[in-house]
Design a protein with these regions (language model features):
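Short helix-coil-helix linker/hinge
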Residues: 126-134
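C-terminal edge and immediately downstream basic/flexible tail or linker adjoining helix-turn-helix-like DNA-binding
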Residues: 2-8, 19, 48, 105, ...
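Short, charged helix-capping/linker segments at alpha-helix termini
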Residues: 2-7, 21-30, 40-59, 72-75, ...
Length: 185
């Protein structure tokens, strides 16, 4: 006879979140199974580094498990999860920048360009954006967050978020146009 957890794949997420809040590890495992690819993809957009993105996604889910009992509304789980993901990313940036400062490396280092003639995909174009612009652009266009939600999640002023999105989108378009036209720099 099948156990209750055999039905978890068919359960609504809100129900699973309620169970996970009560300490049900199997319900949480089902939540992770459902959400892990979207969190990994979000992290990959932020950092353009698969192994790092996977490590950061794992940190996100660990933080979720440790804090899920504090979630007030199970219906708000998706937004809460994204806020944790952004928090983990920002923590990583602060830690990385502190290490760079200690080692004397420049904070302006950018991803290196591929050789001329190799098409630049969206992830590589995103990697050329300054971190704050990339964060805001990804949250807006990939995650569908409103400008206000991004401001609340990142603790940036609303006007700054709007500027980062506008300028970042313009830079992305310019970067993609250069490679689409076969031009090199």
């Amino acid at each position: 006879m099948p156990g209750a957890r055999d039905y978890y794949p068919e359960c609504p997420e809100a129900f699973l979140v309620s169970l996970a809040r009560g300490g049900d590890r199997h319900a949480f495992a089902e939540i992770v199974r459902r959400r892990q690819s979207s969190i990994r993809n979000l992290m990959r957009r932020f950092c353009n580094d698969r192994p790092l993105a996977d490590d950061l996604a794992q940190q996100v889910f660990l933080k979720v498990w440790l804090n899920i009992r504090g979630l007030k509304k199970v219906e708000a789980f998706g937004g809460w999860l994204r806020r944790i993901a952004v928090s983990v990313w920002l923590h990583h940036l602060r830690h990385r920048d502190a290490l760079r400062g200690a080692s004397g490396l420049s904070g302006d280092e950018r991803a290196t360009r591929e050789t001329a003639g190799v098409a630049l995909d969206l992830d590589r174009a995103l990697a050329t954006l300054p971190e704050a612009e990339r964060l805001c652009v990804v949250l807006s266009y990939n995650e569908g967050m409103s400008h206000r939600e991004i401001a609340e999640t990142t603790d940036l002023p609303l006007g700054t978020v709007k500027s980062h999105i506008r300028i970042g989108a313009r830079r992305l378009q310019s970067e993609l146009d250069v490679y689409a036209g076969g031009n090199t720099r």
